[in-house]
């Protein structure tokens, strides 16, 4: 370990806030991409429960028949043209990231309606990747403290 004077340590800590903000921004973007990728992956495949989000119900026979009638596969839940999947985006704020869609259909599917059971692909994706996000954010704080001398690998599972 390198010896550091008290003054050197104070200078190191003074730069910590700036490094933390920089690392936090990078980490939030990385975490948002992880959740966005997972949410897109879930479209078209039945999902089990994840935290407070229930497992997806089987599509109704009438829905399957309608899908086939319109030229789509019978049983790929939430996937028709791919437009809803492609609408999943993220935005970054100062200390937060938001992953979502501006599609009304995405809202109806995520939250459910009177006639459509909720099939959470955003909340479910966030729950399934929470451990990866926690690791990304934790590593970013460590990187800010120790600086670029040490690189810590982050798992993706």
Model features per residue range: what roles?
Residues 1-157:
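Short, Lys/Arg-rich flexible segments
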């Amino acid at each position: 370990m390198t010896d550091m004077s008290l003054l050197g340590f104070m200078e190191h800590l003074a730069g910590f806030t700036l490094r933390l903000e920089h690392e936090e921004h990078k980490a939030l973007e990385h975490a948002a991409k992880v959740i966005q990728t997972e949410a897109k992956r879930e479209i078209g495949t039945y999902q089990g429960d994840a935290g407070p989000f229930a497992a997806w119900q089987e599509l109704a026979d009438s829905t399957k028949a309608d899908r086939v009638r319109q030229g789509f596969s019978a049983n790929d839940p939430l996937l028709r043209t791919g437009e809803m999947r492609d609408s999943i985006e993220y935005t970054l704020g100062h200390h937060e990231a938001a992953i979502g869609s501006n599609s009304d259909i995405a809202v109806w599917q995520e939250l459910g309606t009177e006639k459509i059971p909720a099939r959470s692909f955003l909340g479910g994706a966030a729950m399934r990747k929470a451990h990866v996000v926690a690791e990304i954010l934790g590593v970013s704080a460590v990187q800010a403290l120790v600086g670029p001398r040490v690189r810590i690998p982050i798992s993706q599972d």
